[in-house]
């Protein structure tokens, strides 16, 4: 039997926010005084995945314009969220340029959130016999885990990476299949 190809799909904003807030008490600042914590955190996560996992395929999904469909269904969708910090807003185009220079595909569709893109791509790739790893700290992705779709939670605060398959999701959320 042929070895399954492995596709890694990264949730850009989940990793960018995580990188930024991980260093909130001791931000990384460049010579121009710009907070580069979000950039450093994201790039470190990306490089760790590439070095550790050597994926066959890799892509990064970005939110673009929020979920118009969800706002139509529920007017207050994400209405209580704080405004995105300026350092993150500045970091996003820089991260996209880094990804472009590395020839890493960036996926975004107006009015569609990254988690919906990743979920759709993961299910499509699974049908094509890929093993899919959704790289994110966001537990909401657990609902997508299947025989060939896994959550890949990057290392944080001295803990190693976590890969959640069906048994890990069942244990974590105390659910049965």
Kindly label every feature range from the protein language model:
Residues 11, 56, 63, 115-116, ...:
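Acidic side chains
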Residues 1-59, 69-73:
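Non-catalytic, usually N-terminal nucleic-acid engagement modules in DNA/RNA processing proteins
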Residues 76:
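Arg/Lys-rich, often Gly-containing low-complexity segments of ribosomal proteins
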Residues 8, 59-62, 134, 153:
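Structural beta-sheet core signal
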Residues 2-4, 25-29, 79-177:
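Extended two-metal-dependent nuclease catalytic cores across DNA- and RNA-processing enzymes
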């Amino acid at each position: 039997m042929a070895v399954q190809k492995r596709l890694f799909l990264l949730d850009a904003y989940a990793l960018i926010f995580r990188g930024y807030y991980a260093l909130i008490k001791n931000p990384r600042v460049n010579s121009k005084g710009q907070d580069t914590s979000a950039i450093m955190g994201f790039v470190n996560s990306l490089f760790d995945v590439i070095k550790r996992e050597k994926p066959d395929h890799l892509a990064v999904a970005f939110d673009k314009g929020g979920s118009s469909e969800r706002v139509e269904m529920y007017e207050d969708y994400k209405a209580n969220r704080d405004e995105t910090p300026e350092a993150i807003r500045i970091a996003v185009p820089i991260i996209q340029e880094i990804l472009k220079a590395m020839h890493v595909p960036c996926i975004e569709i107006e009015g569609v959130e990254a988690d919906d893109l990743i979920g759709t791509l993961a299910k499509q790739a699974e049908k094509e016999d890929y093993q899919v790893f959704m790289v994110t700290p966001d537990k909401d992705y657990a609902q997508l885990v299947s025989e060939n779709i896994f959550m890949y939670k990057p290392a944080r605060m001295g803990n190693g990476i976590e890969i959640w398959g069906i048994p890990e999701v069942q244990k974590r959320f105390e659910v049965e299949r």
